[in-house]
């Protein structure tokens, strides 16, 4: 039986007292977003662009609050410039990134950014953990929250499933 990774990740976020959940709507994060929206101790903030999430997270951290940024790999390109601020200022931020452009991807436009995502994040000083199995996600998230540095947990497309708009 496949673990309920969104429930486990929500539990890890709650245990670490994450209070702000910033996200651009994404089907891969849908269940986790719903759990966070239903949690009275968390404030869910829908973004118009992923870049806004970096600023929100920095402000939250400066104000003493923990946050998480949920996005799809295609949105990583939108945060490249401001992600450098995390390293320069020593601001910890957890990003949970659902991957696109991997094996089985039907949308060829997703492939270049999907392939570039780990390297782009690393070039900006973000530590990258890749979860290829559902049971790896929550431990990677909990570990990132304990170490308080800029970290991206990449969730393989094999875990979240291949999107298909042809059905």
Placement of each model-derived feature along the sequence:
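Thiamine diphosphate
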Residues: 1-167
